[in-house]
Design a protein with these regions (language model features):
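Mid-to-C-terminal Rossmann-like scaffold of FAD/NAD(P)H-dependent oxidoreductases
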Residues: 2-4, 294-409, 440-444, 448-477
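Beta1-alpha1 glycine-rich phosphate/pyrophosphate-binding loop at the start
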Residues: 2-83, 176-199, 338, 417-420, ...
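N-terminal Rossmann-fold NAD(P) dinucleotide-binding loop
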Residues: 14-15, 170-171, 538
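A Rossmann-like FAD-binding core segment of flavoenzymes
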Residues: 27-31, 77-79, 83-104, 111, ...
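Glycine-rich dinucleotide-binding loop and its adjacent helix/turn
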Residues: 115-181, 217, 272, 277-279, ...
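FAD-site-proximal beta/loop scaffold in flavoenzymes
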Residues: 133-157, 229-237, 241-320, 417, ...
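Rossmann-like dinucleotide-binding cores of NAD(P)H-dependent redox enzymes
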Residues: 160-161, 168-228, 308-314, 331, ...
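Rhodanese-like catalytic fold shared by cysteine-dependent sulfurtransferases
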Residues: 430-440, 444, 451-485, 493-529, ...
């Protein structure tokens, strides 16, 4: 037999390592140990199993050719030994043995290794609040809990649900409850927005409004402080500083932490973000590798360390570990946290840095915001997809892209293309000139990503001067905050009428194609905030006004297409 490879963890990175290593090292003796009875399942599919999109939990455990990934499958098809219900309790690095115990009997044993792989994943963070351990409070940490939750839904035991945490998993679970099952669902998020630190507030607001329109109550800026039990000891209420919400079930989706205790107790180098590894995913012990949610990852844009708990990355990392076990020397460049999330009839996605994150990382960052069509404007299924391109003004490097749109592949296509370019240090020019596939049913002749880059170019070269969304919203909430501002609305009169009626002198109407004739009628003592539907007409008007000496203008990036999705309180009633 060849080298003894022992892998701790059998969900994503571990099985991927084992299967790739088997293909590269036919003579290796490969063993996976996992403390659970279920292995190698699609954990990211759990919310869709709960929702009913995936009918049977066994589908999450099957291959694309419909074989269930269990111990027998791995042994017979892959030649890999899997020991389930076996907990790794220690690593004897000197003697190169993994210390394990049987979960049921407590019997202890050792497994010798030449190379060890730690892929222990992550563990849910449970808020340290009263009632967090009550019956009826669940984390989404494994398939067993998902089966239990779906069983309660299917038997009519859940009429109301509270999800604590407005991250991706929490929102996916909220949709799962509210959509198919019709459960009265509330989301409680401590931070002032959904998907905090991942997307910028204006994109979060669009997401929040859509979820509320689909029947989910969203309470941001208020964390859960207590979970109250009924007379049977079951969770029945969630308390925040502002309200008490009745519930039949509580989902604790407040993030995850790396499961790195085994490595730490063995004396390996760890950080708050996970097990420290080099670019070949070796730990501080060259005979021990690590992959998946349990490792610390370098951000490919900022260079900062972070935790990236994504099944896609875990599989990629597992392959790289196997390559290095076989001596191929494959390196891991890091990650950017690219994600896409379904939210009822919409989706939201991002890659790289948000504007807030980019500025916090020290970049001279700005953002081009657009609302382009996802396909030819004359095509029947055309829809707008608000996009944001974050860039560094000093270097023209693109730092991140965010998108929001209908539940199709339009946003995903732009996020994926952006991720590939950003990973290679792509600039505004690279994005502007990137050749994207085109046919009217799929895209516009000048793709949405190209258009966003062109806006970024105009901004970076100071051809286009913008008012930011936060600045515009603050002014709309209180005109006295910027008394020398006025809106110049160049949309069709039918679109403008309600605004001029409501806002009076603060709202100037001048149709786009009449500006060249009538610009002398514009007020000269005001800074004009030029508004159209998506920003294109506004920029052209700004360029023209500059040419005739009127330079006190600012463009609202993304136009009112963004505003309608954000549903501000000042919006005129229909």
């Amino acid at each position: 037999m060849g080298e003894k490879i022992v892998i701790v963890g059998g969900v994503a990175a571990g099985p991927k390592t084992a299967c790739r290593a088997r293909r590269l090292m036919p003579d290796a003796e490969i063993t996976i140990v996992d403390q659970d009875s279920l292995i190698s399942y699609g954990g990211c599919g759990i919310p869709y199993y709960v929702s009913g999109d995936v009918a049977d939990e066994d589908e999450l455990r099957k291959t694309s050719f419909h074989m269930t990934r269990n111990e027998d499958f791995f042994l017979r098809a892959k030649g890999v030994t899997v020991r389930t219900l076996t907990r790794a309790v220690g690593i004897n690095r000197k003697d190169k043995v993994l210390e394990v115990e049987d979960v049921k009997s407590g019997t202890k044993d050792t497994i010798p290794y030449d190379k060890l792989v730690i892929s222990t994943g992550s563990q849910p963070f449970v808020l340290p609040i009263p009632g967090a351990d009550l019956d009826g409070v669940y984390t989404i940490s494994d398939l067993h809990k998902a089966i239990d939750i779906k069983g309660k839904l299917a038997t009519g035991q859940v009429g109301k649900a509270v999800v604590i945490g407005g991250g991706a998993i929490g929102l996916e679970m909220a949709e799962a409850f509210a959509d198919l099952w019709g459960v009265e669902t509330s989301v409680v998020e401590f931070m002032p927005q959904l998907l905090p630190r991942i997307i910028d507030p204006w994109f979060s607001t669009m997401l929040e409004n859509h979820m509320q329109s689909m029947g989910v109550d969203i309470f941001t800026g208020e964390g859960a402080s207590e979970i109250i039990a009924d007379e049977n000891g079951k969770a029945c209420k969630v308390v925040t500083p502002n309200r008490t919400i009745e519930t039949d079930i509580v989902i604790m989706a407040t993030g995850v932490r790396p499961r790195s205790q085994l490595a730490e107790e063995a004396g390996l180098l760890v950080s708050p973000f996970g097990i420290v590894v080099n670019d070949r995913l070796q730990t501080s012990d060259p005979d021990i590798y690590a992959a998946g949610d349990c490792i610390e990852v370098s951000h490919m844009v900022s260079g900062q360390k972070f935790m990236a708990p994504l099944g896609s990355l875990a599989n990629r990392e597992g392959r790289i570990v196997a390559d290095n076990l076989a001596g191929l020397g494959t390196t891991y460049p890091g990650a950017m946290g690219s994600f896409i999330m379904k939210a009822f009839e919409r989706c939201i996605g991002a890659t790289g840095l948000s504007l807030e994150s980019a500025r916090a990382a020290g970049f001279d960052a700005d953002a081009a915001i657009t609302a382009p069509s996802d396909r030819a404007h004359f095509f029947p299924t055309e829809s707008k997809i608000p996009l944001q391109m974050v860039f560094d003004r000093r270097t023209r490097r693109v730092l991140g892209v965010q998108g929001f749109g209908p539940m199709n592949d339009a946003v995903l296509a732009r996020i994926d293309a952006a991720a590939a370019l950003i990973a290679k240090g792509g600039t505004i020019d690279d994005f502007s000139l990137c050749e994207m596939a085109y046919a009217p049913p799929f895209a516009t002749a000048l793709d949405a990503l190209n258009a966003a880059a062109n806006v970024a170019d105009n901004m970076q070269m100071n051809r286009q001067r913008n008012v930011s969304i936060p600045e515009f919203m603050a002014w709309m909430d209180d005109f006295s905050s910027q008394p020398d501002w006025a809106a110049l609305d160049v949309r069709h009169p039918n679109e403008v009428k309600a605004f001029t009626e409501k806002f009076g002198d603060a709202w100037v109407e001048m149709v786009y194609d009449s500006v060249r004739e009538n610009y002398k009628k514009l007020p000269t003592d005001k800074t004009l905030l030029i508004i159209c539907d998506a920003g294109t007409r506004s920029f052209e008007v700004q360029i023209f006004l500059d040419s005739v000496g009127i330079s006190n203008t600012l463009v609202l990036g993304g136009g009112f297409n963004m505003m309608t999705r954000m549903e501000p309180e000042w919006w005129p009633s229909k």
